[in-house]
Regions:
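Short juxtamembrane and helix-loop transition motifs at transmembrane-helix boundaries
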Residues: 54-64, 81-90
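Internal alpha-helical transmembrane segments of multi-pass membrane proteins
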Residues: 23, 27, 82-103
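Membrane-helix boundary connector in multi-pass membrane proteins
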Residues: 108-122
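Short, Lys/Arg-rich, polar N-terminal cytosolic tail immediately upstream
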Residues: 1-23
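Transmembrane alpha-helical segments of multi-pass membrane transport proteins and ion-pumping complexes
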Residues: 34-46, 74-82, 107, 131-136
């Protein structure tokens, strides 16, 4: 009688893909963090007398408007990152280039819609802080090449 020994190989290191959470989970968390940060910036600026109005005495942007718009546009960025993760040849660099370009474009209204200087500076700061939270978080989840 002969016995056959079957060897099975086991890996002690988990597969990096299986251990990582998907892009969207980190993106949603970063979006919420960015919304909180931009709302805090708006609240601090408002407390310091910044109006966020395009004309003197006109209605300004409410602080919760910062949270709402930050969430909406950050989640659009999460969707872009998810699509680029599946379709782009170089997802990380494609996403970073696109996000930087969109961040630069996002400050154009702050400079051209007639905001006073403190309002424009606060809005640009809010855009920059939101991008500084969301973009590196998403870029870190994307692979360099597909």
């Amino acid at each position: 009688m002969t016995t056959t020994q079957i060897r099975t190989s086991t890996s002690t290191t988990p597969a990096p893909v299986a251990a990582r959470r998907p892009v969207w989970k980190h993106g949603v968390a970063a979006s919420v963090g960015a919304a909180v940060a931009t709302t805090a910036i708006a609240a601090l600026a408002s407390a310091d007398g910044v109006s966020f109005a395009t004309e003197p005495g006109g209605p300004g942007i409410p602080p919760l408007g910062f949270a709402q718009l930050t969430l909406i546009f950050s989640l659009i960025g999460v969707g872009m990152a998810a699509v680029m993760a599946r379709k782009a040849r170089r997802p990380r660099s494609t996403f970073v280039r696109t996000a930087v370009a969109l961040t630069v474009l996002s400050v154009v209204p702050d400079l051209t819609f007639g905001f006073d200087t403190p309002s424009a500076v606060s809005l640009i700061t809010a855009h920059t802080v939101a991008a500084a939270i969301v973009v590196p978080t998403l870029a870190g989840r994307l692979s360099r090449t597909r």
